[in-house]
Design a protein with these regions (language model features):
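...captures the hydrophobic TM-helix bundle architecture rather than a specific catalytic motif
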Residues: 2-68, 76-430
Length: 430
């Protein structure tokens, strides 16, 4: 994401520290209110409901041993009601607890990444922040190599990293410190690569144009983005083809209802989600959130490239978008908020499915969680990139000369949105 040449004062980086601390405080506050506050109340309600369930089960057992048929039926009805209350109380607790924990972790990561931008730019001298026309040519960057190397090391050590984290959480696993350290080193190198990329990008270099076939005359990074998106299409096509191939061999409730088989042998996520508005609601909200976020990223690009931008005559809009620079920043912030909502609701939904016994251990569960998890990871990576874009919009700013950065990211974000529009009906409704 290229930028034009600007004079960025060193005191600007102090603002990033304050914002990072604010993000960290917001995440901890959300955890305290949602998970620690409301979550604790919901947990107490769940414990009470579970106690009532145990009592009703004992009464049902007694009725089965010595009671009449009428008493047995009455006891069974009481147990069923208590069971429904217990399940609802458990899911309510998971909703608040998972939301609080997710927001806390997300905002800690946000604070770290936003702080990285300030750190890597604050170590530059004032002269480096302001480069003249003689230094406009960009001679290449080590950032892609650093980021690729960091990702490689992280993935090499990832199995050991997961096992070690499980061991530290008290589960019955032996820590694998070799894998954990390998992933940790990879993470550090990845962050260094990202920080160096941000430092280089903020200075701004002219957009490089391809000089040979087949992309002659085209912006190099735009062509690169399209090639990257083609590879991403192949990744998600693999998920879809696996799901559709296996789905044809499953006897699901949908297949039974259609008369294609007689006995259900596989429960899919859609079997648990599509029959009730409340269970389907998180996925539906996420669909609209991503569609709206595609619109807001376009508005950010439009504001950046509109040389005749004028403040709205509407009082509310004028207050939200008082200047062209702040309009770009605020549209990006709205996009981040919508994407963050997607991640929170996704993990809340996951917690409900796991609580109901739909886990990654089953074939249907593995396809569902891997596909939606991979998509969620793409959303989260996009949110981290947008953090830098917000940082840049708030400092040097975007305009008609450097707005292609938003345009290229917008291509990625639209792809992520379109992927979800395909995932939602296939995995939630079918």
């Amino acid at each position: 994401m290229s930028g034009s040449l600007h004079d960025v004062k060193n005191e600007v980086w102090m603002k990033t520290v304050v914002i990072a601390i604010g993000l960290l405080f917001t995440g901890l506050l959300a955890y305290g209110v949602l998970a620690g506050g409301v979550g604790s109340v919901k947990h107490s309600e769940w414990e009470d409901a579970h106690h009532e369930l145990e009592n009703s089960e004992m009464a049902w057992n007694v009725a089965n041993e010595s009671g009449t048929v009428a008493e047995q039926n009455a006891a069974e009805k009481v147990w069923e009601d208590a069971h429904h209350v217990d399940v609802d109380a458990h899911l309510s607790y998971l909703t608040w607890s998972t939301a609080g924990k997710t927001i806390m972790v997300m905002f800690i990561v946000y604070a770290a990444f936003y702080g990285v931008a300030g750190f890597f730019n604050s170590i530059q001298s004032e002269e480096e922040h302001h480069e003249g026309d003689d230094h406009e040519e960009h001679h290449g960057s080590a950032s892609p190599i650093l980021m690729a190397g960091g990702i490689l090391l992280f993935m090499m050590g990832f199995p050991g990293f997961v096992v070690t984290c499980k061991a530290w959480l008290g589960l019955d696993y032996e820590p694998n410190m070799t894998g954990f350290m390998l992933s940790s080193v990879g993470t550090i190198i990845l962050i260094m690569g990202i920080g160096n990329w941000w430092r280089e990008d903020l200075k701004g270099y002219p957009e490089q144009i391809a000089t040979s076939h087949p992309f002659k005359g085209q912006d190099i990074r735009k062509a690169g983005m399209w090639i990257f998106l083609i590879s991403e299409m192949m990744v998600f096509a693999t998920f879809f083809s696996s799901y559709l191939r296996m789905r044809t061999g499953w006897c699901t409730q949908w297949a039974v209802d259609a008369g294609k088989c007689e006995v259900v042998d596989t429960t899919t996520a859609s079997d648990l989600l599509r029959h009730d508005v409340m269970t389907l609601l998180p996925g539906a909200i996420n669909t609209f959130a991503l569609i709206i976020s595609s619109y807001t990223i376009v508005l950010a690009l439009k504001a950046a490239k509109n040389v005749n931008w004028k403040k709205s005559e509407n009082a509310l809009m004028a207050r939200l978008f008082p200047s062209r620079k702040k309009a770009v920043r605020n549209y990006l912030l709205i996009t981040i908020a919508l994407g963050s909502l997607f991640i929170v609701l996704k993990l809340v939904e996951w917690s409900h499915l796991i609580a109901e016994g739909f886990t990654i251990d089953s074939q249907a569960g593995s396809i569902f969680f891997v596909t939606t998890g991979a998509h969620g990871l793409h959303v989260f990576i996009g949110l981290l990139v947008m953090l830098f874009m917000v940082f840049k919009a708030d400092t040097v700013g975007y305009d008609e000369k450097n707005g292609q950065g938003i345009e290229y990211f917008g291509l990625y974000w639209h792809f992520v949105d379109l992927a979800w529009v395909a995932i939602f009906p296939a995995f939630y409704l079918y």
